[in-house]
Amino acid sequence: MAPLLALFYLLQLGPGLAALFCNQNVNITGGNFTLSHGWAPGSLLIYSCPLGRYPSPAWRKCQSNGQWLTPRSSSHHTLRSSRMVKAVCKPVRCLAPSSFENGIYFPRLVSYPVGSNVSFECEQDFTLRGSPVRYCRPNGLWDGETAVCDNGASHCPNPGISVGTARTGLNFDLGDKVRYRCSSSNMVLTGSAERECQSNGVWSGSEPICRQPYSYDFPEDVASALDTSLTNLLGATNPTQNLLTKSLGRKIIIQRSGHLNLYLLLDASQSVTEKDFDIFKKSAELMVERIFSFEVNVSVAIITFASQPKTIMSILSERSQDVTEVITSLDSASYKDHENATGTNTYEVLIRVYSMMQSQMDRLGMETSAWKEIRHTIILLTDGKSNMGDSPKKAVTRIRELLSIEQNRDDYLDIYAIGVGKLDVDWKELNELGSKKDGERHAFILQDAKALQQIFEHMLDVSKLTDTICGVGNMSANASDQERTPWQVTFKPKSKETCQGSLISDQWVLTAAHCFHDIQMEDHHLWRVNVGDPTSQHGKEFLVEDVIIAPGFNVHAKRKQGISEFYADDIALLKLSRKVKMSTHARPICLPCTVGANMALRRSPGSTCKDHETELLSQQKVPAHFVALNGNRLNINLRTGPEWTRCIQAVSQNKNIFPSLTNVSEVVTDQFLCSGMEEEDDNPCKGESGGAVFLGRRYRFFQVGLVSWGLFDPCHGSSNKNLRKKPPRGVLPRDFHISLFRLQPWLRQHLDGVLDFLPL
């Protein structure tokens, strides 16, 4: 422990008193532990165990008398232990079904070890809904969905009896209610204890689940649950589109003229270490960047709290709608703002949110659509239960009343309560705070702060978006190459080399004109374009309806001047025979100078094409990417301005390709972007022509060029396209890419009505 920290605790005890440090004999059999402030009073000791085991007890706290405070086996109380209970790692087990109506399950055990399965079968005339086989996971929870045997005879479907719960209520018609409780007092019920069959045939509230006190959620489960509510809120743009599908449940439709208020509440109380608070901040930053990458109007509030809340950013500020300002404010949030406050006052931080809402309503007018159409999402990140102030549930009630949250306005408020760590997280309190909606979960407990960061890194999976929102790739760690660049397509015109292209709408592909050099264009109906991953079920072949090649392209145009190949106007369009269904494997990239790209860049509606070029290519060295034949995303640096002039000089020095060239501009016109000056720059291979040259801005991707030609082929002579050779000594590699900013007139001529273009 740091000397200054030890001195702080001595001073806290007052003059003449000595701090009593706690006993260090606190090891756990089969596990480890961490200390928040060494062995001094106030320090928190947290135990951890290998996957599939849990610590008992979970934690201890060093008191001022030098004794350890140890929790009861119950998840709701603590006591001062008269003797030290030996800490051990115990095996995790999953709860057994307490009842299964109209069917059987097997094997029948009191509880189930990690790795075991339980199977469900229905009686005759009943149909199984949910998972027929469920697997006991290392976090103490079953995978899959609750198995239910139903005959469909009632107004609402049989709500089932989830594992570990007991239900009263056998009728499922309109107005009927069912009630749930846990079959053991040691368990904690999350979800709705009471549900009512509604006129729309859906049960009110959310499915109740009983959990062991030591159970927790995996990051992928939480990310999936958040996606259900947030992905479609951010991606849906057509208010008349029917988005209700069985797999996704509820959808929030927000028009481009609508608005989302996002409130991020970060716990900074004493039980949160400064390191974990920094992870809270990083997670919030990831959330902000992801949400601002979608095409909706967003205001973000940031509030840190311990004994009292501190507003870092208010939704009432214009700055709350600027992603840069929001992230700057997040960075400025300091753990030390609350260093003298030891409590966790969740009520006060929620009342601060209520006050913001009240002020905004007063400003906009209670009866105006500007106020009524705002959606509100609250995300509470905490590592413990509220231990001071009024009941947080009362604050939630006031918020719901202010927003008039009733059955027909339930979609206008989502509250996510995320507990981090197993120190003193109160399942009951989290469940009371989280929203209750059919098919969704809003209360979670994660094992640690690192798991929280994983959620925000992997959330908002675009595979669920059904409209043609452009330039969105799946950046999660487990995404495939095609999911990261879903606009990438490949095709092979007859006997020519494979070429690449980019999906720019649901039916049009942009590529290079030289892919069609010396072939019979009337045979285009025989070509096949591979969209999606051609090596998996997600890949599909499309026929070509039409080919449009820039009329100025002629590879032999300057042969008489001693220039064997000339690639000006090296651009073409393919119209597919049918529209591509949007998915995580197939989605268009954003083309600059279009309305879609303008919204993705979050620029004002009055922006111009020149504004886009300035924003995307203003630096003399611009990091960008292209996609290799094997699907890998490779890196280049585009050169502009004076650096472009330096970059193209290598052409005149290459006497093997251009033996008599005296003026570089005869070969490299201002249509071309240049790369290859950096040693770490990748060089495209033959067969990668026509692919997108693109760059990213806040999780959205924009095509600024397409691969055209180069001075060095790193794959020449190699049958393995995964191996790229370095250029031999004396050879200066350079690559040239058609700039989409220079061929705007041609693009507008042929894509008018397909894409909405901005003024030049």
From Swiss-Prot:
Binding positions for Mg(2+) per the UniProt entry: S269, S271, T344
Keyword Aminoacyl-tRNA synthetase set for record: no
Give all residue intervals belonging to the VWFA domain. 261-459
Which SMART domains has this protein been placed in?
CCP (SM00032), Tryp_SPc (SM00020), VWA (SM00327)
Q: Localized where?
A: Secreted; Cell surface
Claim: Ribosomal protein is one of the keywords in the record: no
UniProt xrefs under PANTHER family: COMPLEMENT C2, SUSHI DOMAIN-CONTAINING PROTEIN
Name assigned to this protein: Complement C2
Q: What is the lineage of its organism?
A: Eukaryota, Metazoa, Chordata, Craniata, Vertebrata
